[in-house]
Amino acid sequence: MRTSQYLLSTLKETPADAEVISHQLMLRAGMIRKLASGLYTWLPTGVRVLKKVENIVREEMNNAGAIEVSMPVVQPADLWQESGRWEQYGPELLRFVDRGERPFVLGPTHEEVITDLIRNELSSYKQLPLNFYQIQTKFRDEVRPRFGVMRSREFLMKDAYSFHTSQESLQETYDAMYAAYSKIFSRIGLDFRAVQADTGSIGGSASHEFQVLAQSGEDDVVFSDTSDYAANIELAEAIAPKEPRAAATQEMTLVDTPNAKTIAELVEQFNLPIEKTVKTLLVKAVEGSSFPLVALLVRGDHELNEVKAEKLPQVASPLTFATEEEIRAVVKAGPGSLGPVNMPIPVVIDRTVAAMSDFAAGANIDGKHYFGINWDRDVATPEVADIRNVVAGDPSPDGQGTLLIKRGIEVGHIFQLGTKYSEALKASVQGEDGRNQILTMGCYGIGVTRVVAAAIEQNYDERGIVWPDAIAPFQVAILPMNMHKSFRVQELAEKLYSELRAQGIEVLLDDRKERPGVMFADMELIGIPHTIVLGDRNLDNDDIEYKYRRNGEKQLIKTGDIVEYLVKQIKG
């Protein structure tokens, strides 16, 4: 490819609305352009990277025995109503009607469509197991699209769906997909971790996320410092303290705290250790409960884990925090003065709170707290559950080592769905015993566009992108200095361009009438791994300057050796 016949579209300045480095560099390197909120046009350089990610994904899915299909982006609403997700999915599901007033959705995922296909196409257990995948555009009407293609409304996704007649068969495919995903992300060159995860709105039993480690990540990923344990913070179990609860040393005292409406203010004004405070959060109770709200208690320096809390049988799903008006209607006090003593609604406390003594909490009276609260003496110990986020230094749930926490970008997710969708859509086959058998399902997703952004978050420097070799838009850049004035430079540039292309190497020849500084800056911004510079001065000694983008090292190589050298560097 020649730059004179290519849309390079690089930018010198960083766009003001680009928050994370991948968004900034994708705009500056001419990979994407914003069309509307959460919608991006992919330019030639971006498409080249995207296609390389797609190809790696496709190769490994095929190697794992999956079969490629293509399903419509537009899906009829009746399938979503049949599965129950029409009501469950919420406003991220973009709904519309056609000219015949028939309701449809823009697909954020394709469980319903593939299950509908299979229930009409398969009839016998002998046809199973099967695993289908597609690489296709999805749409989710994000409330706040941000970070460029990291959280956009329209994106490219590889989604796969497997069908089985037994849990053992599902486990085999699940393990094969786990291995395929590991190969995909390793081939791309990402530093990633596979972690246990919550199944979320997709549903099902077992689930793993594939997280690319990066400071800009939206997820907290938890690891043991000793074992292979890894989990999303939503799922990581907070182990109960091993030490028995300390004996009470204080009497419970009612204290005026008119200016302490938060834990931080309480700690600062009364010089309390934050570990001796408890915060109380009120959430909506499950429909049909005799109480409208449920009180959830965590230690003052801990955070409520909303995923764990939502799984409590007495808590409404989705988890909804009570408004001040709702709180006052039940407790007769505001949110800053809540606690377990005389709480008129059901209470669930975290395991760590259950082990506390002599602690401070709201008195359920505005502007007052109780200090020196002790369980069973001042208030009966309520239901105890794991409802907090783990913190760094907590013991690992597998009993080996302590926990570390890093930020991660989710690029892949695999689920064991079980029979959630097949039961709802009545997808079954004749089993080996001749009876009708509901199918067991798995689903497996990779955010292809997100992989591109995640790769940049791990691979950049002050000059631009430093692509992993496997997904770089071009493998070699040829920079001929003053080629329009030097016939020797022009002739050699054309010769090397032809020879490298003949070897199957992707080359970008910069034949623009530009200053050398602009040419160097653009190639480094785009992140092409191998650059060769042709100039009259070096050619006087039969030399070509070679530079490797990742480490910035330069060396002079003889003109007769440069093609062989590059082929060896790229192909091994």
Curated annotation (Swiss-Prot):
Example GO BP: prolyl-tRNA aminoacylation
Pfam family name, one: tRNA-synt_2b
Record InterPro entries: aa-tRNA-synt_IIb (IPR002314), aa-tRNA-synth_II (IPR006195), aa-tRNA-synth_II/BPL/LPL (IPR045864), Anticodon-bd (IPR004154), Anticodon-bd_dom_sf (IPR036621), Pro-tRNA-ligase_IIa (IPR002316), Pro-tRNA-synth_IIa_bac-type (IPR004500), Pro-tRNA-Synthase_IIa_type1 (IPR023717)
Compartments reported by the entry: Cytoplasm
Alphabetical list of PROSITE patterns matching this protein: AA_TRNA_LIGASE_II
Group of enzyme by EC: ligase
Gene3D superfamilies to which the protein is assigned, alphabetical: Anticodon-binding domain (3.40.50.800), Bira Bifunctional Protein, Domain 2 (3.30.930.10), YbaK/aminoacyl-tRNA synthetase-associated domain (3.90.960.10)
Molecular-function GO term, any one: aminoacyl-tRNA deacylase activity
GO terms for cellular component: cytosol
Assigned EC number: 6.1.1.15
Alphabetically ordered keywords of this record: Aminoacyl-tRNA synthetase, ATP-binding, Cytoplasm, Ligase, Nucleotide-binding, Protein biosynthesis
Top-level lineage group: Bacteria
Catalytic function, reaction form: tRNA(Pro) + L-proline + ATP = L-prolyl-tRNA(Pro) + AMP + diphosphate
Subunit record text: Homodimer.
Primary role: Catalyzes the attachment of proline to tRNA(Pro) in a two-step reaction: proline is first activated by ATP to form Pro-AMP and then transferred to the acceptor end of tRNA(Pro). As ProRS can inadvertently accommodate and process non-cognate amino acids such as alanine and cysteine, to avoid such errors it has two additional distinct editing activities against alanine. One activity is designated as 'pretransfer' editing and involves the tRNA(Pro)-independent hydrolysis of activated Ala-AMP.
Entries under NCBIfam families matching the protein: PRK09194.1, proS_fam_II
Domain notes per entry: Consists of three domains: the N-terminal catalytic domain, the editing domain and the C-terminal anticodon-binding domain.
Family: Belongs to the class-II aminoacyl-tRNA synthetase family. ProS type 1 subfamily.
Name by which UniProt lists this protein: Proline--tRNA ligase
Organism, scientific name: Escherichia coli O139:H28 (strain E24377A / ETEC)
